[in-house]
Design a protein with these regions (language model features):
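N-terminal Rossmann NAD(P)H-binding glycine-rich loop of SDR-like oxidoreductase domains
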Residues: 21-37
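Mid/C-terminal beta-alpha module of Rossmann-like enzyme folds, strongest
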Residues: 29, 219-266, 307
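Adenosine-cofactor binding site in Rossmann-like domains, unifying the SAM/SAH pocket
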Residues: 45-62
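NAD(P)H-binding glycine-rich loop region in Rossmannoid oxidoreductase-like domains
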Residues: 59-96, 109
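Catalytic helix-loop patch of NAD(P)-dependent Rossmann-fold dehydrogenases
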Residues: 95, 99-103, 110, 123-124, ...
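NAD(P)-dependent short-chain dehydrogenase/reductase
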Residues: 153-201, 207-208, 214
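Substrate-binding strand-loop-helix patch
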Residues: 174, 199-210, 229-247, 297
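Conserved C-terminal active-site "lid" loop/helix of NAD(P)H-dependent oxidoreductases
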Residues: 236-242, 259-298, 302-307
């Protein structure tokens, strides 16, 4: 592990002390969006870490880092998200999605820090006929969903008043590998694509999720518990793909709807995973963009990067 420089002093900005923020998994989609939104913000002194800088599966290292650096907020963007691979790599998924979260919780408890932890719609079985609320029963159908739920539970047990869990779904951005970038590439290189039409949910632009997290840590209120966040609206993966191609101006690729049965995968996916976001909107006053608007913003940003 590389030595990350430890803090010696806190700066005072205006009438407030600078808050020390630790972001884990900072090289991923959400981590990169957090970098973008916090850049140049003097209210926060932010440590951006990934496994090379901070191995969150190592409890002693985590505790030393968080306590020594007087961390106020931990934003855990780290996760094992390879849903199908998790079925064959149970221990790796458990280590990152459960045990590492426990390590962060224990360290946060000792340092009196607060934790914002990102979770998933996969904690639900997908059999609902209405958008899932935070109080609805969980019933994960995959190793990924099970390990993420275990991470939620252990964090809430260790720091009941100092945790916020944000469940999200269908995350995409200009960074890393994700569905939007894959469909853009396939749309430009394939004549025909088959995409599942009977799995229903809502895409989430990582930039919008990062903004929601920023609003929470900037707020003077802290209401612990579970929250749901995706963009507004509902679609299938087929609808999502058609809209991606429409916005990008891809016209020479035929997108055909197929059923989940026609596209078998190792891990079971929720057939319906629309999340009810009323709680986060009411408590923190967060305005959530419609999914098509955010998708257009992301694709425009990708196009700018290509120029």
């Amino acid at each position: 592990m590389k030595n990350v420089p430890y803090l010696t002093t806190r700066k005072k900005t205006s009438n407030h002390m600078q808050l020390n923020i630790l972001i884990t998994g900072s090289n991923g989609q959400l981590g990169n969006e957090m970098r973008k939104i916090l850049k140049g913000n003097d209210s926060f002194n932010t440590f951006y870490t990934d496994i090379e800088e901070l191995d969150i599966s190592n409890r002693n290292v985590v505790e030393e880092f968080i306590i020594t650096n007087k961390i106020d907020y931990i934003i855990n963007c780290a996760a094992y998200t390879a849903v199908d691979l998790a079925e064959d790599n149970i221990e790796i998924a458990r280590t990152i999605n459960h045990m590492a979260v426990e390590n962060l919780g224990i360290a946060a408890h000792k340092a009196k820090a607060k934790v914002i932890h990102v979770s998933t719609d996969y904690v639900f079985d997908g059999t609902s006929c209405h958008p899932y609320s935070e109080e609805d029963s969980t019933n994960p159908q995959s190793v990924y969903g099970t390990t993420k739920l275990d991470g939620e539970k252990v964090l809430a047990k260790i720091i009941p008043n100092d945790h916020i869990i944000i469940r999200t779904a269908w995350l995409y951005s200009i960074y890393g590998k994700n569905f939007v970038k894959t469909m853009l590439n396939l749309g430009k290189t394939k004549d025909c694509l088959n995409v599942v039409t009977d799995q229903i949910g809502t895409p989430t632009y990582a930039g919008d999720l990062a903004n929601a997290i920023y609003q929470i840590i900037s707020s003077e209120k802290w209401i612990p518990g579970i929250y749901h966040f995706t963009n507004e609206g509902v679609c299938s993966w087929y609808d999502f793909t058609k809209t991606i191609h429409k916005i990008a101006g891809i016209t020479n690729c035929i997108v055909q709807p197929i059923s989940t049965e026609e596209y078998p995968s190792k891990a079971k996916r929720p057939a319906y995973s629309v999340l009810n976001k009323s709680k986060i909107k009411q408590i923190y006053g967060i305005k959530i963009p419609y999914w098509v608007d955010s998708l257009e913003k992301c694709i425009n940003e990708l196009n700018q990067d290509l120029k």
